[in-house]
Amino acid sequence: MSLFDFFKNKGSAATATDRLKLILAKERTLNLPYMEEMRKEIIAVIQKYTKSSDIHFKTIDGNQSVETIEVEIILPK
């Protein structure tokens, strides 16, 4: 593969394959069986150290294979 091949347009089959990979990666990350248990454990640890019950999770789309979960914690005064 040369440097010029890098900038060459992909064919429709390659583009379709890449799109399918994106869809499968997204579906795989959404259906992980341990995600709900992990969220509960994270909430328990946060509550143990902060005494906060106002905890929110938000899913943020990352790159092709990574999905980010943002945790928002409202601390009591």
Swiss-Prot record:
Cited SUPFAM superfamilies: Cell division protein MinE topological specificity domain
Species the sequence originates in: Helicobacter pylori (strain Shi470)
UniProt entry tagged with the keyword Phosphoprotein: no
Entry function: Prevents the cell division inhibition by proteins MinC and MinD at internal division sites while permitting inhibition at polar sites. This ensures cell division at the proper site by restricting the formation of a division septum at the midpoint of the long axis of the cell.
Homology family: Belongs to the MinE family.
UniProt cross-references to HAMAP family, sorted A to Z: MinE
Pfam families per the UniProt record, alphabetical: MinE
Lineage start: Bacteria, Pseudomonadati, Campylobacterota, Epsilonproteobacteria, Campylobacterales
GO BP terms, alphabetized: cell division; regulation of division septum assembly
Keywords from the UniProt entry: Cell cycle, Cell division
Gene3D superfamilies attached to this UniProt entry: Cell division topological specificity factor MinE
Residue ranges of coiled coil: none
InterPro entries named in the record: MinE, MinE_sf
Name this protein carries in UniProt: Cell division topological specificity factor
